[in-house]
Amino acid sequence: MSLSDPLGDMLTRIRNAQRARHAVCVAPASKLRASVLEALKREGYIRGFAAEELRKGVAQLRIELKYVEGQPVIKEIHRVSKPGRRVYSKIKELPRVYAGLGVSILSTPRGVLSDVEARAANVGGEVLCRVF
């Protein structure tokens, strides 16, 4: 099956798994997805993730979701830049998510970074998603 938006699919899997209170969800593996998950882990939104090879050339990401007192840490997770409408932002024009309580994940020349890391590195890029 061909997906037009693989990253959006992974974000939807995370959103659905957290609403169902699952401890783990799985998604097909890719470098971009792994980079986004690494940024979410650095910001404390997930416990961790691991790549599992199903067979030669086919891998999946096992994502460990995070809960605090039974409530999901991720309240909202939305795709911003989509295949049909890419959204780019200079670092000075990047708005804060919920007045700094949430983060944006950006694809920059220095890799996939959260908005906090991008501001520290003074680089802009494509706004992949927002997390709160």
Curated annotation (Swiss-Prot):
Matches recorded under Pfam families: Ribosomal_S8
GO cellular component: ribonucleoprotein complex; ribosome
Keywords: Ribonucleoprotein, Ribosomal protein, RNA-binding, rRNA-binding
GO-annotated biological processes: translation
Residue pairs linked by disulfide bridges in the UniProt entry: none
Classification via PANTHER family: 40S RIBOSOMAL PROTEIN S15A
Quaternary structure and partners: Part of the 30S ribosomal subunit. Contacts proteins S5 and S12.
NCBIfam families, A to Z: PRK00136.1
Its job: One of the primary rRNA binding proteins, it binds directly to 16S rRNA central domain where it helps coordinate assembly of the platform of the 30S subunit.
HAMAP family attached to this UniProt entry: Ribosomal_uS8_B
Protein name as annotated: Small ribosomal subunit protein uS8
Species of provenance: Gluconobacter oxydans (strain 621H)
Lineage: Bacteria, Pseudomonadati, Pseudomonadota, Alphaproteobacteria, Acetobacterales
